[in-house]
Amino acid sequence: MTLHSSIDRVTDRIRERSRNTRDSYLKKIARAAEDGPRRAHLSCGNQAHAYAAMDDKDDMATTRKPNIGIVTAYNDMLSAHQPYERFPDLIRRAGHAAGATVQVAGGVPAMCDGVTQGRPGMELSLFSRDVIALAAGVALSHDCFDSALYLGVCDKIVPGLVIAAATFGHVPAVFIPAGPMPSGLPNDEKSKVRQQFAAGEVGRDALMAAEMASYHSPGTCTFYGTANSNQMLMEFMGLHLPGSSFVNPNTPLREALTVAGVERAAAITRLGNDYLPAGDVLDEKAFVNGIVGLMATGGSTNLVMHLPAMARAAGVLLDIEDFHDISESVPLMARVYPNGLADVNHFHAAGGLGYMIGQLLEAGLMHQDVKTINGTGMDGYTAEPRLDGERIRWEAGSTDTLNDRILRPVSDPFARTGGLKQLDGNLGRGVIKISAVAEERHVIEAKARIFSDQEQVKTAFRAGEFTEDTIVVVRFQGPRANGMPELHSLTPTLAVLQDRGLKVALVTDGRMSGASGKVPAAIHISPEASTGGPLARVRDGDLIRLDATMGTIDCLAEDFDTRKPVAFDPASSSEGMGREMFAAFRAVAGPATEGAGVVV
């Protein structure tokens, strides 16, 4: 199928924009790879230190068996990462069977936004991505590994690991998922209880019972937020094995897929005939495919910020216009909560990513001719994994959706576009996701209420101060102000106001993830207020027009452009809960439109 003209045009634009940086990157990883397998160049003393604790130290010192390094984000506080506790032993056995040796190269931190929502710790969340990249870099700096396995699932973890994999782009990389937890209390019922609690209609006991019934076992949360968007992304970009993203933890199929991933990691090293450095996988076509998947599934807006940072590590320069243009061409094919009632388990059962990839390829909406760890182009990702004894056999996936209330073909989508819009105006540049927003709320013109943090919004709500249509402006939430925390805890409050018949919207230089749903939210506004950006000039009562249809965001006050910006006071977010240690990160973080990066 001929590539869609818009996808072709955006890819060419990215390629041209990235010509110099990508060329420099490819030369860098070629230099790193040219002297062959890494550990052969270590001195005997260096090697003895590296192998001292290993049972197979003789193999490591005297043979040419590939040595696989594991970079793991295991902890048992994150339900999505708890299954990784068992993975190193399984990977060692699989590696030995495949003629390789295996070492845990190092661990990286992994924090849960679901735990830190609305708390001071959330101000460390975005920067944890860069810490993860740095920690993975330290793990790989021993220069002992012929390929690397990356164990990570959730919000900042996968982007941080991809940044590291790209930086060590001469080392082949395989990402190993852990899978979503089985379905619990339906997400829409959980959301309803949250809104009832916010409105004072139920007590904390009912809220706690609903939350525990929803988040109830090992595995990723089942709504389609950033964590599950990450898993989709790794499959669409060819870093997972086909059909592996949404298989539940602790099942025979999950274990067999992990074994198969180890076998691929052993097969694609420079020691064999199928050398596949990570940097060759992570090209402009792979990133375009990732954006296509984000739009077709209605994925998290956090990836609009993470993908530019990930791409930059591989010498590829993305802009939010790329997301906008791809969104305009790629239809919304899935309804997964918060865009629908289904969860990721239902999506997977309906045909999942394999069906979707097949449809997009047939329509020319994604690149087929890419390098993947599967050893094929993207057509190999239309297959489904099946157990054949204890091993994996891939067979042709369904060419028909198995539930058209959850998953639809390109020819009959839920919406013509992916629902992500670029916003531009005198308030700056940002994005809005409208796939779950009712059409009558795509344009809102209302007076502004100005807040400097989300707790102020909740206090005003409890005081009954919202009695008319309102644009809620929460500023000083950018990366240089306070680390750009997730503002998802505002969702129940704003949803209650909307359900009362008010037109409300959020405008912020902070984040509001893809789990946020039906309230219009203009997010990632840049330049951010703390650097003198336009949001710092907005006043209470100003008329603001948010027009997702035209892609504009403007303050209509006549004197707006001549006002002096309000100064940012960092006192409330400069210390406590480790925030003082991240002052250096806040000082140098890039703009959200470029990924809010520190190390890239």
Question: What is the role of each PLM region?
Answer:
Residues 129-136, 141-148, 458-466, 471:
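Contiguous domain-boundary segments centered on the initiation and propagation of an alpha-helix
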Residues 1-76, 80, 89-108, 120-121, ...:
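Catalytic or ion-coupling anion/metal-binding cores of large enzyme and transporter domains
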Residues 140-161, 172-176:
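A short, small-residue-rich loop immediately preceding and capping a beta-strand
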Residues 83:
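Glycine-/small-residue-enriched capping loops at alpha/beta junctions
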